[in-house]
C-alpha cells in the first residue's frame, strides 16, 4: 500500500519541473522571437559593433561590461568628422526601419531594481544621515534615550508631568544644567545646600527639586525651620530660640511633607528679608544659616541637636 502511494506521489514532481522549464523557455522565446521588433541602431552601436568584436578577440578574458566602458570612453574622444560616417549610417538604418515597421512604437521594458547592499541594511524611514556610521549613530541614539529616560524619571519624582520640567526651567530660569541634576545629584548636594541656605530662592522649581532630590538635605532644611522662623519674626530672640532643640525628622515622609504649595510659599517667604526686619538682623540670619549649613555638611549634629558654638 505504501509503495503504491509513493508511486502515485512521485510523478507530479518532474511534471512541475518540466512546467517551470516550459515557462522559462516561453519567456526566452518571447524575448528572442523573430516577431519582436528591435530598435534601430544608433551611431555608437554601429561603430561599436566592429570595435567590440575586435576588442573581445584581443582580450578574451575581459568582461563585456568592461569592454562597453572602454568603448564608450573611446567614442567620446572621437571628433565629429570621425563620427560623421557612423551617424549617416544610423540615419539610413532608422529610415529603413520606419519603412519596414511603420506602426512601430518603442515601449521600454520595466526592469526590477535590485537593492544594493548599502540600501538593504539602512534603517527604515531614512533615520541615518547620509555618510553616517550605523554603529556610532546607534550608540548615540541609545545614550540619548537613556538621558531622556532619566529626565522623565526625575520629572515624575518632582511631581511634574513629562515636559513640565523643561517649561518650568525655561520660565523660572533654573541655573543648573538639567542633564547633571539627575545623574550627579550626590556630587552636587553641597552646592545645593550653599545656594539655598546662604542665598535666596530663585524659583519654586529649584526649591521643589531640592526638597525631593535629597532626603539628607530635607532633614537639615527642616531642622533650620525653627531658628529661621524666629529670626524672621524678631531679631532679638535669636539666642533663646536657637538654644531650644529643633524637631528631629525620622522618616522620609516627614521630609516630603513640606512640599505642599502653601507651606512652600511660607518657607520661601521665611528666607526673604522683610521690610520690617533691620539690616543687622538679616546679616545675622545669613551668618546663622551658613553656620547650620556647615554643621549639617560636616556631620557635627548629634542626636538631631545643633551645636551652640555660635553663641
UniProtKB/Swiss-Prot annotation:
InterPro entries: HMG_box_dom, HMG_box_dom_sf, SOX_fam, SRY-related_HMG-box_TF-like. A motif (9aaTAD) lies at residues 266-274. Keywords: Activator, Developmental protein, Differentiation, DNA-binding, Neurogenesis, Nucleus, Transcription, Transcription regulation. GO terms for biological process: cell population proliferation; epithalamus development; eye morphogenesis; fin regeneration; inner ear receptor cell development; nervous system development; otic placode development; otic vesicle development. Residues 1-40, 232-259 are annotated as: Disordered. One of its GO terms (cellular component) is nucleus. The keyword Transcription applies. CDD domains: HMG-box_SoxB. The 9aaTAD motif is a transactivation domain present in a large number of yeast and animal transcription factors. This is Transcription factor Sox-2. It comes from Xenopus tropicalis (Western clawed frog).
Amino acid at each position: 500500500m505504501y509503495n503504491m502511494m509513493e508511486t502515485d506521489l512521485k510523478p507530479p514532481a518532474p511534471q512541475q519541473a518540466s512546467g517551470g522549464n516550459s515557462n522559462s523557455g516561453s519567456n526566452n522565446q518571447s524575448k528572442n522571437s523573430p516577431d519582436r521588433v528591435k530598435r534601430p541602431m544608433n551611431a555608437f552601436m554601429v561603430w561599436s559593433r566592429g570595435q567590440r568584436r575586435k576588442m573581445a578577440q584581443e582580450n578574451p578574458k575581459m568582461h563585456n561590461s568592461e569592454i562597453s566602458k572602454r568603448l564608450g570612453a573611446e567614442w567620446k574622444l572621437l571628433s565629429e568628422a570621425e563620427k560623421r560616417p557612423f551617424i549617416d549610417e544610423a540615419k539610413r538604418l532608422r529610415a529603413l526601419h520606419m519603412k519596414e515597421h511603420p506602426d512601430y512604437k518603442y515601449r521600454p521594458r520595466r526592469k526590477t531594481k535590485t537593492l544594493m547592499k548599502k540600501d538593504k541594511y539602512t534603517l527604515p524611514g531614512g533615520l541615518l544621515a547620509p555618510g553616517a556610521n550605523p554603529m556610532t549613530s546607534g550608540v548615540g541614539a541609545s545614550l540619548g534615550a537613556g538621558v531622556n529616560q532619566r529626565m522623565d524619571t526625575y520629572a515624575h519624582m518632582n511631581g511634574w508631568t513629562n515636559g513640565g520640567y523643561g517649561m518650568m526651567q525655561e520660565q523660572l530660569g533654573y541655573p543648573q544644567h538639567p542633564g547633571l541634576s539627575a545623574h550627579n545629584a550626590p556630587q552636587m548636594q553641597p552646592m545645593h545646600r550653599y545656594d539655598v541656605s546662604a542665598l535666596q530662592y530663585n524659583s519654586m522649581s529649584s526649591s521643589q527639586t531640592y526638597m525631593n532630590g535629597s532626603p539628607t538635605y530635607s532633614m537639615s532644611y527642616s531642622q533650620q525651620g525653627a531658628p529661621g522662623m524666629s529670626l524672621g519674626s524678631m531679631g532679638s530672640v535669636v539666642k533663646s530660640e536657637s538654644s531650644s532643640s529643633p524637631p528631629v525628622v525620622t522618616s522620609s515622609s516627614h521630609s516630603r511633607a513640606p512640599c505642599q504649595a502653601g507651606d512652600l510659599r511660607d518657607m520661601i517667604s521665611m528666607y526673604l528679608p522683610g521690610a520690617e526686619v533691620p539690616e543687622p538682623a538679616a546679616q545675622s540670619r545669613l551668618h546663622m544659616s551658613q553656620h547650620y549649613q556647615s554643621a549639617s555638611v560636616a556631620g557635627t549634629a548629634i542626636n538631631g541637636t545643633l551645636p551652640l558654638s555660635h553663641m
